[in-house]
């Protein structure tokens, strides 16, 4: 029996700015699993659309975005300096570019385009074909890997999430207001939950983690107990 036979797929879904990627990345590092940031993939498509005229003044031209899909190649490369993978579009590093408020304001609209979701879900399923994967997003446990052995659904108070996002962006030198970020968080929640294709929802068998008042270490302690219970022979 190979080592991968003992490993599982872990799906981490939830609201924006809950720290899903940070937590999923920490889980993967702790377990020696592969981490796949699906949110970064949707942000990468959004960035490409912005740079190629498919989004103008915040208005998304869905047909124009669809026409761009065949021109987008998304890859991840491990960055030893960060201890994590960076995302590339057509060979260009875009890790920093996809985290701007401009991308955040449009990513929910782009994510709702059926052709975009179809392309990226297929890519994600291929990436996660082997066991030993931690994947975070909005529809991992419901659409991408509905048979994942362990599913988490992360949530936190919108004001807490907005403050976290504000601190992250201002630390990078971006000029934003807390009010702007909180509005963006609430608008993304509404868009993610109401879209026709793969809306954000908690899988019936997902375990909820509200991390409004938890540190990353506290979340990890909680997770490792859950993981031990779920993987007991």
Enumerate the predicted regions with their spans:
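Hydrophobic anchor at the beta1->P-loop junction of P-loop NTPases
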Residues: 12
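Conserved lysine of the Walker
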Residues: 20
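Residue-level signal for inorganic ion chemistry
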Residues: 39, 91, 120, 134, ...
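N-terminal phosphate/diphosphate-binding loop that engages ATP/GTP or pyrophosphate donors
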Residues: 30-98
């Amino acid at each position: 029996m190979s080592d991968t036979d003992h490993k599982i797929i872990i799906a981490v879904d939830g609201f924006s700015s809950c720290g899903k990627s940070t937590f999923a990345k920490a889980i993967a590092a702790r377990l020696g699993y592969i981490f796949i940031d699906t949110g970064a993939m949707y942000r990468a498509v959004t960035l490409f659309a912005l740079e190629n005229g498919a989004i103008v003044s915040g208005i998304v031209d869905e047909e124009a975005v669809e026409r761009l899909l065949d021109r987008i190649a998304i890859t991840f490369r491990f960055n030893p300096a960060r201890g994590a993978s960076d995302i590339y579009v057509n060979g260009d590093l875009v890790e920093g570019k996809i985290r701007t408020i401009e991308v955040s304001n449009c990513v929910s609209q782009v994510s709702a385009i059926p052709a975009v979701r179809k392309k990226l879900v297929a890519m994600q399923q291929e990436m996660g074909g082997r066991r030993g994967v931690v994947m975070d997003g909005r529809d991992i446990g419901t659409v991408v890997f509905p048979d994942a052995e362990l599913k988490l659904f992360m949530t936190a108070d919108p004001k807490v999430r907005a403050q976290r996002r504000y601190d992250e962006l201002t630390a990078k030198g971006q000029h934003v207001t807390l009010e702007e970020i909180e509005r963006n968080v609430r608008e993304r929640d509404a868009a993610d939950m109401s879209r026709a294709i793969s809306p954000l929802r908690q899988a019936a068998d997902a375990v909820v983690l509200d991390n409004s008042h938890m540190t990353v270490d506290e979340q990890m302690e909680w997770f490792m107990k859950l993981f031990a219970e779920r993987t007991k022979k």
